[in-house]
Amino acid sequence: MANLTKLKIVTPYAQILEKDVYSVELKTSEGRITVLPDHNPLMSTIENHVAYIRELPNTPRKPLLLLDGIVYIEQHQVRVFSDYFKFLDEIQIDEINSSLNQLKHDLNNEEDDKKKLQLKSKIKLNESILIAYKDR
């Protein structure tokens, strides 16, 4: 059995992924890195991007979308705290575009400042998802 690393991804939306993987490819503020088992400890910010995990050494990479966050890397563990994550094959671009249009419409018609801030936050999230998705 290959030497594996525990990957854990957590978001404010309670999206959690926890699995054993062989490698994790991330885009940090310093550039792209690949984390393999027995990696040296590292802490870095991550940018909006498509990351890749490989469950075993000779298996295909599995893409997932990550938005801004922080990664903590230890010898046999990678912990990612991200604003959002989802596997690329689960993302429905048409739904995100439709949602974005509706949110913008709602924002233009909203009077309440608190609700406007909430709508702006949701718009920014959806726009970030689209940008990161297109940048794959």
UniProtKB/Swiss-Prot annotation:
Claim: Transport is one of the keywords in the record: yes
Role according to the record: Produces ATP from ADP in the presence of a proton gradient across the membrane.
Location(s) in or outside the cell: Cell membrane
Family affiliation: Belongs to the ATPase epsilon chain family.
A molecular-function term among this protein's GO annotations: proton-transporting ATP synthase activity, rotational mechanism
Bilayer topology annotation: Peripheral membrane protein
Xref: InterPro entries: ATP_synth_F1_dsu/esu, ATP_synth_F1_dsu/esu_N, ATPsynth_dsu/esu_N
Cellular component, GO annotation: plasma membrane; proton-transporting ATP synthase complex
Organism whose genome encodes this protein: Ureaplasma parvum serovar 3 (strain ATCC 700970)
Subunit-level organization: F-type ATPases have 2 components, CF(1) - the catalytic core - and CF(0) - the membrane proton channel. CF(1) has five subunits: alpha(3), beta(3), gamma(1), delta(1), epsilon(1). CF(0) has three main subunits: a, b and c.
Location (main, coarse): membrane
Record carries keyword Ion transport: yes
Protein's recorded name: ATP synthase epsilon chain
UniProt keywords, alphabetically: ATP synthesis, Cell membrane, CF(1), Hydrogen ion transport, Ion transport, Membrane, Transport
